[in-house]
Regions:
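Conserved beta-strand positions in the Rossmann-like core of class I SAM-dependent methyltransferases
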Residues: 4, 28, 144
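N-terminal Rossmann NAD(P)H-binding glycine-rich loop of SDR-like oxidoreductase domains
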Residues: 3-23
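Non-catalytic, hydrophobic alpha-helical segments
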Residues: 12, 67, 132, 146, ...
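Conserved Rossmann-fold cofactor-binding substructure of NAD(P)-dependent oxidoreductases
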Residues: 42-64
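N-terminal Rossmann-fold cofactor-binding loop
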Residues: 30-35, 50-51
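NAD(P)-cofactor binding segment of oxidoreductase domains
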Residues: 69-99, 124-131
């Protein structure tokens, strides 16, 4: 497959690029600063541009099969970039979009005190990501949203748990970026995650290559 990656110079985005290439995919990375992506591979194409610019996103999506976004940022970067994806993807003939989000956005999964504290401390980020996800859910795109717990730089291959309905998040939940990256690449190529959200964290119940049919709606 030909995959487009947004956020490829970030900690998780770099791992998405590496794992996608290792799996035999062709990758196009749309980045603001190409010099920050030092990885070299004949199947990696780097394009300079803003993820918030629909024209740049459309250009990157030319001939692509799917898009994976691991974007972070402040202000309205996430919602603006998501709207750019919603606008550009149909014009480019691409419908498959996988977006990495934060467990902090799933506020109803926290206890009331944690919900209040994180809501105050991370209000801007939660508002931005929530707005972007709303635009994605209301679109006709074939989207998947992956909610990941706190990220670590540990090695891949650790256990991963999919939170089922009714399970609560804890601020102590952690997962390796490499395992999140593996999930994102799997999801981009799996019809089982179509128009679904997935909540993942590290744990002892399943292995890192846990089957995608365990996802929740």
């Amino acid at each position: 497959m030909k995959l487009v990656v947004l956020g490829a110079t970030g900690g998780t985005g770099r791992l998405v690029v590496e794992q996608a290439l290792a799996a035999g995919h062709t990758v196009t990375a749309l980045v603001r600063s190409p010099e920050k992506l030092t990885l070299r591979n004949p199947n990696l194409h780097v394009i300079a541009g803003q993820a918030t610019d629909p024209s740049a996103v459309s250009h990157a999506l030319d001939g692509a099969d799917a898009l994976i976004s691991t974007l972070g940022g402040t202000g309205s970067v996430i919602s603006d970039a998501t709207q750019a994806i919603v606008d550009a993807a149909p014009r480019a003939g691409v419908s498959r979009v996988v977006v990495l989000s934060s467990f902090l956005v799933e506020r109803d999964r926290f206890d009331p005190v944690t919900r209040l504290l994180t809501g105050l401390a991370m209000r801007s980020m939660i508002k931005d990501k929530s707005a972007g996800e709303k635009a994605l859910r209301q679109s006709d795109l074939d989207w998947t949203i992956v909610y990941a717990s706190g990220l670590t730089d540990g090695p891949t291959g650790g256990p991963v748990v999919v939170l089922t309905e009714g399970r609560r998040w804890s601020l102590s939940h952690r997962i390796a970026r490499a395992d999140v990256a593996a999930w994102l690449v799997q999801a981009a190529t799996s019809p089982q995650t179509s128009r679904r959200s997935i909540s993942i964290t590290g744990g002892a119940r399943t292995k890192a290559n846990v089957k995608l049919e365990a996802v929740r709606k």
